[in-house]
Amino acid sequence: MSNRVIIFDTTLRDGEQALAASLTVKEKLQIALALERLGVDVMEVGFPVSSPGDFESVQTIAKTIKNSRVCALSRALEKDIDAAAQALSVAEQFRIHTFISTSTIHVESKLKRSFDQVLEMAVGAVKYARRFTDDVEFSCEDAGRTPIDNLCRMVEEAIKAGARTINIPDTVGYTVPSEFGGIIQTLFNRVPNIDQAVISVHCHDDLGLSVANSITAVQHGARQIECTVNGIGERAGNCSLEEIAMILSTRKGELGLETGINAKEIHRTSSLVSQLCNMPVQANKAIVGANAFTHSSGIHQDGMLKAQNTYEIMTPESIGLNRNNLNMTSRSGRHVIKHRMSELGYGEQDYNMDVLYEEFLTLADKKGQVFDYDLEALAFMEAQAETDDHYKLQQLVVHSDSTEGSATATVKVAVNGETITEAATGNGPVDAAYKAVARASGCEINISSYQLSAKGEGQNALGQVDITAKYREQNFHGVGLATDVVEASAKALVHVMNLTWRADKVADCKQRIQQNKRELGGV
């Protein structure tokens, strides 16, 4: 049996299900490219039949990704498989992933069928998917609670039908490692054609055991792990990709297993997913948390000074978190910024140097020294910018009355190239700024959540504001970044306004297409 574990990333499918606001196609493509750099073997990027937006994002990613296999999910229904195949047809290499529930509670309560009927549907779906590709994965949903005789029978028949990967999910995160390892071992002992497929596992974290269950599974013969960056996902989340990658790397001598993951891309990928998904990483999160390589105990610090491996089983550098002694100030030239971006893992194609350097100088003039996290934050915001923004914040001036708690904001907002100046009074500076921007733009946005975080340390740290806003029954996520919290808040609002403007344009375009179809049909 091979010692290579296939890493199947489902950040853009299962992970996205946890988000308050859906990612845009551009944001999904950014994450897909980061996953490709990270070295994932397979990336599951959506559920094409679920919506036109999901279909478009799967198709866009499938056209772009070259080094990872692109996968799409489908139920055990021909219409789902057709949509997946159509969206993936432009990919250099792709996989169709079809699934159906197999546990008694799901079969009887959700599907309201007999197990034999479900088995027939599964076999039919695998055979149908094989018409489009040899790479078909089949999942036994809620396998962790499926009677073992039924599970063995389902796996055997799915392999006979042509599935080349069989996924055993712990869908509700219910099993413990000894139990889950036993399920995998039983499949290898009792399914006669098990050697004709790769056994995969997909573990949820409801009891905090997703990583432990996944490691136990590969110790018992599974050779694919399904996971997400930062462990994001439905309910309590999924198995964490970075934890799996570093466990298999750090304990390679004991486990004898390896992956194709480029660990030096872990920190960068984790940060990107956290920012785009508006899901901060908890400080004590293994591998990528802010405290993962921080030592505060005097005894620990003393040991670290004597020998780093006294209290570190891996280094920050191993996940791409470099210790940098290079001071970047307003006197730093373009070559310094380019060199530092290269050391941080960014290629010239990942950012616009002219825009980034201009933003860097503005920030350096404000705070003096610019750090790595500042530079990465600026690169992130530059990557989010669009050339066709309908709204642009040109100026913001705020006056606050600390005795009454009121504030007045004056803004200049460019609306389709025309500058409009407005002022408003509000209950604090952020409220005043939002009211002024709304007046200037004529765009009313209902904000459902507001989150402020610091990007860096000290009083000059960049502030990042993430807002979720509801517009026409849809959630949109906006991000703003500035050393001034009120300015960051206004930028986040303008970001959302541009997203809603584009959504309206798309809706109008679809309406015109439908109208043209109706008119042509009536001729």
UniProtKB/Swiss-Prot annotation:
Listed Pfam families: HCS_D2, HMGL-like, LeuA_dimer
HAMAP family in the record: LeuA_type1
Catalytic activity: 3-methyl-2-oxobutanoate + acetyl-CoA + H2O = (2S)-2-isopropylmalate + CoA + H(+)
GO biological process: L-leucine biosynthetic process
UniProt domain Pyruvate carboxyltransferase: residue ranges: 5-267
Alphabetically ordered keywords of this record: Amino-acid biosynthesis, Branched-chain amino acid biosynthesis, Cytoplasm, Leucine biosynthesis, Manganese, Metal-binding, Transferase
Any one Gene Ontology molecular-function term assigned to this protein's record: manganese ion binding
Listed NCBIfam families: leuA_bact, PRK00915.1-1, PRK00915.1-3
Required co-factors: Mn(2+)
Protein name per its UniProtKB record: 2-isopropylmalate synthase
Organism name: Shewanella pealeana (strain ATCC 700345 / ANG-SQ1)
Function summary: Catalyzes the condensation of the acetyl group of acetyl-CoA with 3-methyl-2-oxobutanoate (2-ketoisovalerate) to form 3-carboxy-3-hydroxy-4-methylpentanoate (2-isopropylmalate).
Pathway: Amino-acid biosynthesis; L-leucine biosynthesis; L-leucine from 3-methyl-2-oxobutanoate: step 1/4
Enzyme class: transferase
Subunit comment: Homodimer.
Signal peptide (UniProt feature, chain positions): none
